[in-house]
């Protein structure tokens, strides 16, 4: 279903050795199939500089995972689906709201210039993902990976290991995807 499609899609931007760390507790055949499928061969779309892939919505688990991160991480979360019916075509259109964040824990020992350099690198990685997303619509399945508008905002979270970076919010559009 669409949640795992999103997981797979954004995993394609993560180097395999980093992606391997995402799979912590294999507990089912479906889990193993997903892990083995993604790790079998590189996507060719990996972006250098990403040191962790974090996917989910559980605030406590996210905080635990991110507290152990030392470099730049790609964090993907989702939160709502809106559906409409196009009466002219009797087609259901769905939009899934997603936030994609590229951030890095910034220790208090870093000064503002160091933080700005980190923020600039995070924005560079997020912009690279955004550029690729514009070219990735899956017309066969009726999915637009980024339905504009997309909003980029500064991300700062003391609760997530004092992380700083950039976040992009947008909708994924699809024809009857849920």
Where does each model-flagged region fall?
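Small/polar-rich, solvent-exposed N-terminal microdomains that initiate assembly or binding
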Residues: 1-89
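Short, surface-exposed beta-strand/loop "edge" segments at domain boundaries and coil↔beta transitions
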Residues: 83-84, 110, 176-178
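Exposed beta-sheet edge/beta-hairpin loop segments within beta-rich domains
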Residues: 84-92, 155-162
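Extracellular/virion structural assembly segments
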Residues: 89-95, 103-131
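Oligomerization/assembly interface segments of phage tail-like spikes and tubes
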Residues: 92-107, 161-176
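Acidic-leaning, charged glycine-interspersed low-complexity segments
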Residues: 118-173
């Amino acid at each position: 279903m669409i949640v795992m499609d999103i997981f797979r899609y954004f995993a394609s931007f993560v180097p395999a050795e980093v992606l391997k760390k995402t799979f912590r507790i294999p507990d089912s055949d479906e889990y193993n199939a997903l892990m083995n499928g993604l790790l079998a061969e590189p996507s060719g779309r990996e972006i250098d500089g990403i040191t962790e892939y974090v996917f989910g919505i559980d605030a406590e688990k996210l905080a635990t995972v991110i507290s152990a991160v030392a470099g730049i991480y790609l964090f993907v979360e989702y939160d709502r689906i809106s559906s409409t019916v196009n009466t002219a075509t009797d087609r259901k259109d769905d939009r899934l709201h997603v936030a994609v964040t590229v951030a890095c824990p910034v220790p208090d020992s870093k000064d503002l210039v160091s933080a700005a350099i980190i923020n600039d690198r995070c924005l560079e990685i997020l912009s690279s993902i955004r550029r690729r997303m514009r070219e990735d619509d899956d017309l066969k399945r009726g999915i637009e990976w980024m339905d504009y508008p997309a909003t980029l905002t500064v991300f700062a979270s003391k609760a997530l290991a004092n992380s700083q970076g950039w976040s992009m919010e947008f909708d994924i559009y699809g024809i009857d995807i849920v």
